[in-house]
Amino acid sequence: MNDNQTVIDLDLQIAVEGFELPSQAELELWVKTALRDTMSEAELTIRIVDVEESQELNSTYRGKDKPTNVLSFPFEAPPGIELPLLGDLVICAAVVKQEAMDQNKPLIAHWAHMVVHGCLHLLGYDHIDDSEAEEMESLETHLIESLGYINPYKEQ
């Protein structure tokens, strides 16, 4: 499947003000890149939030009482039902900005990385153990570099 054939229905929710955010077109490109060769169509929500909402969701769903860069909530259809609904990503603008500065990375490249990373989680990838982490990071690096950005795991 050619990634240009992937149809994306992206519901973008912006629940934060005062940050430089990527455009809907950029977000859609990054989602299409992450879904390359996996789905012909996909529906997902990306919600960009503040520190408080990120921390509340991270505490509720992961037991970690701090904000985080991206949370992924995959949609699980009942058995036998095929739907293009992928799930939801919640991205904290303040954390992404701070991480980009701390890691000396261009903000736009870090946004791309967070969207690709979150989409891979929606597809079932994880980084709980070393072998899973290695597989996921390798795929992330390939996808991010295909977008023209540098390896997100390379020290700056």
Curated annotation (Swiss-Prot):
Transmembrane segments: none
GO BP annotations, alphabetical order: rRNA processing
Record Gene3D superfamilies: Metalloproteases ('zincins'), catalytic domain
Any single Gene Ontology cellular-component annotation: cytoplasm
Binding residues for Zn(2+): H117, H121, H127
Pfam families recorded: YbeY (PF02130)
Family of this protein: Belongs to the endoribonuclease YbeY family.
Protein name: Endoribonuclease YbeY
Lineage: Bacteria, Pseudomonadati, Pseudomonadota, Gammaproteobacteria, Alteromonadales
